[in-house]
Amino acid sequence: MFTSQRQLRQNGSPMSSSRSSQHSSGTASPISDSPASNRSYGRDLRGLMGIDIPANEPAFNRANSSDTIYFRPKKIYKMEHEHPSRSTLVQLQTRSQPDDVASSQVNPEGGTDDLELGDPCGNQSLYTIGAEYVPDLDFTKLVNEWQKSTEDLYEFRSSATPQVQIKDSGKGNYELWSSPDAILTQNKLRRDSFSQENSDSLSPEDSILSRNLHSKVKPIPLPRNSQQIFTPLSNLEAERRSSYTTSSNNNSITQNNKFSFAKLKYSLPTQSSAVPASFDSNASSLNFLPTTTLSTLSELQISPNDMMDLIQKLPRNFLNLPYTQRKKVIIEHAPSHDYKAMMSLVKKFMLTSSRSNFSLAGFANNASVSQATANDDNINSRNTPNNSNDTYVNTRPLQRSRHGSIASQFLSSFSPSMTSIAKMNSNPLSGSAGGSARPDDKGMEILGHRLGKIIGFGAWGIIRECFDIETGVGRVIKIVKFKGHQNIKKHVLREVAIWRTLKHNRILPLLDWKLDDNYAMYCLTERINDGTLYDLVISWDEFKRSKIPFAERCRLTIFLSLQLLSALKYMHSKTIVHGDIKLENCLLQKEGKKSDWKVFLCDFGMSCHFDEKHVYRNDTFDENLSSGNSHRKRKSIEQTNLIKYPTTNFLPDDRTNDFDASENLKYQFENRKHQPFTPKGMVSSSSHSLKHLNQPSSSSSSNLFHKPASQPQPQHRSPFHGRHKTTDFSNLEPEPSKYIGSLPYASPELLRYSDARRSKSVEMHIYDSPDSSQSEISAASSSSSNLSSLSSSTKASAVTNSGVTTSSPSGSSTDFPCIVSPLGPASDIWALGVMLYTMLVGKLPFNHEFEPRLRSLIKVGEFDRFSLAQVCKFDRKKNEGTIGQGLYDTVIGCLTIDLDKRWKLKRIEEVLQNEMNLSEAIHDNNGS
């Protein structure tokens, strides 16, 4: 028969409270079925366990009890036998309550608690084994087997759990623990046979080592023997300390020093070095050099003094020479050593510029200082430096360094500052090694300037920054290499021939030039500050996402375009067409307010002269000019234009190239007049990152003069003269294939001319492009048939609807007519219209990834006019549609296909000037 209990009653005793807490956790205890039997069961059990029963306790009336088991004979049976029999009534407990030894507890009054019976099986979700009478049960054997199984379980867990070795920080030894859980339950582990004695608790500083992990390496102990290493002195500190050597007490530097120098020490493990002891001694000037450097010196079997002697023999611009030249110089002076290792050492210690203070010279003349720093035991004892070192200090003064670490000094030695380069006055070529250096390499001297780094690239050449050897003023040199390519050489000569004649305050000046007949052309010019108009438009973004108001965008476009118009009018007055007008070729210099911004036209590689009677001249000159002597007429044209266009009054003497001039422009942005223009060494720096306009690649060279520089340079006014006065610039007309500078800016007549030259017509040498109409081909044929009727005394010319000009000499009706170039002022005006549109809208008017399609769009003049109208008519309702209307009409007039209807420069200037005046008036009214 089985009996069980559910819950002990709460009677306030500690034991009953413990029982109640156990019940709340879901654990039950075995007991009988009724309160009456509970009292009887507790009384008999106390007697069975040898507990004395009070005499005054009344006996229970079993007649009124419902129990079916009578325990008194069992007590008598136990008393009669020495050991319990197999029929013993036992109390089996679960492991959840290992401390339960009885089914009832004694209350403080000495009685037993009334216990409630458990519910029948099925009504309770959790039961334990209650008091049970099991016949033939050997309880002792059962308990022993249970204990043995528990021990086996713990042994299995200990073998499967990684053993953790814990270091006792107090005792310095290691102890084994079975698991992290065992660490927290230290008392329980003491009962296990596999644990070791440990009475100390863990601390956060204790280190843990898992022996069963893949890494069985013990922690690396910290070294006990270490040497003190000091940081090297800076140049300023070394120079300050070296000044104390002239005092009366040369053996005690710190006695005369009022400053306390803090020692920076670091403890590092002692490492063996293959360097001889002489290098590690305090007397050596290299006693705190990097170990790798000392090892290199040891491997090369060269002493520091020998290294200094070698450096003295090298040219002062050794690091600026090409690699092949440096190699030859090293082999010449040190043939028995590895030139690569020697070059590495020289790079580390040769420079004494502001970018590097870690040099042999600095260590040689501060040997006593380094000794004082390295010696910690005798800091007040110093050695007197020798006289030779003192002399070297006076000849090679140290400079303050901005870089403190050895690593940064070593890296900076590979890229010396341009200040030190500009101060080098010696010949860059020395000895037999000089023949291998190219004349355009970094560090070379050209036109009185020292070449610096490359800051731009072009179609055939590069742009290098340069510095005046005498003054240090920064400029740029355009280097175009031809090396036997006669076509490129002719192209460069043509550019210089035109550029040297252009002297205008809105044209980038050619300060000096030099021709190397077998190598390259060098063109010296100023350096402009703030990028190009292309950079400015990129900063504005497209009109839909414009970062500035439309009103300001239109005013700035007009203001900058009027300056460009001044340069174009001057060039056209000299019968010169630019041929490559675009945003990238308009340099921008920002000075203070926006009203002080200046535009400079550059890149004359596509420029050429055009005939005065050119049909594409677009009425650049006065119509009443006679067709007499060409030379006299050209001279009178310049005089006429100077009177007609007072804004182009800057024409200095050819003997000087004074880039500074006063200007009295009619158009202003906010102020009515400009201040005298004095460029301040034009240094370029574009602060914003660029994103390129989506346009096809062009065949022209990009702008090369707007790269950044370090600082503004002083004004340069000394005249320059070309180095080749006898250079023949005749017969340098551009090749027909080079008429198109940038395809998105090309005019329709240039494209048709290019298509006609690519064709192979037997009669006219004119075949139109695949996208041209048959009417254009017929018009070209009819135009050529009319050539025979022209006068024999003049050179006949005709213009077809397709924009192709044909001419034929007199009396040569049987000869094939040649095609006259359409490149003229009208082409520059078309490109100007493309520029205006791009500045206003923020994108090119003609743009397509497929080049044939782009050509077709340009020929038919198809572009987005609605976007242009949105920008130009930004406040049409408020101002009755007058503001921006002239700017819109100007762009449309410039982008007109019909040459007769395409606007002229004079009309463009008048309309834009009126727009500017009206905009300023409205701006002043709004401000007031």
UniProtKB/Swiss-Prot annotation:
Its EC number is 2.7.11.1. ATP binds at I455, G456, F457, G458, A459, W460, G461, I462, I463, K478. Keywords: ATP-binding, Cytoplasm, Kinase, Nucleotide-binding, Phosphoprotein, Serine/threonine-protein kinase, Transferase. Residues 13-29, 375-391, 769-813 have a biased composition (Low complexity). The active site is at D580. It catalyses: L-seryl-[protein] + ATP = O-phospho-L-seryl-[protein] + ADP + H(+); L-threonyl-[protein] + ATP = O-phospho-L-threonyl-[protein] + ADP + H(+). One of its GO terms (cellular component) is nucleus. Residues 449-912 form the Protein kinase domain. The modification Phosphoserine is found at S178, S179, S405, S426, S737. The modification Phosphotyrosine is found at Y739. Its main location: cytoplasm. It is found in: Cytoplasm. Coiled coil: none annotated. Pfam families: Pkinase (PF00069). Residues 1-43, 81-118, 374-394, 670-741, 767-813 are annotated as: Disordered. The keyword ATP-binding applies. GO terms for molecular function: ATP binding; calcium-dependent protein serine/threonine kinase activity; calcium/calmodulin-dependent protein kinase activity; calmodulin binding; protein kinase activity; protein serine kinase activity. GO terms for biological process: intracellular signal transduction; proteolysis. Serine/threonine-protein kinase involved in the phosphorylation of the NAD(+)-dependent glutamate dehydrogenase GDH2. When overexpressed, confers hypersensitivity to rapamycin and induces rapid nuclear accumulation of GLN3 to activate the transcription of nitrogen-regulated genes. Interacts with URE2 and GDH2. Also interacts with the TORC1 kinase complex. This is Nitrogen network kinase 1. The lineage of its organism: Eukaryota, Fungi, Dikarya, Ascomycota, Saccharomycotina.
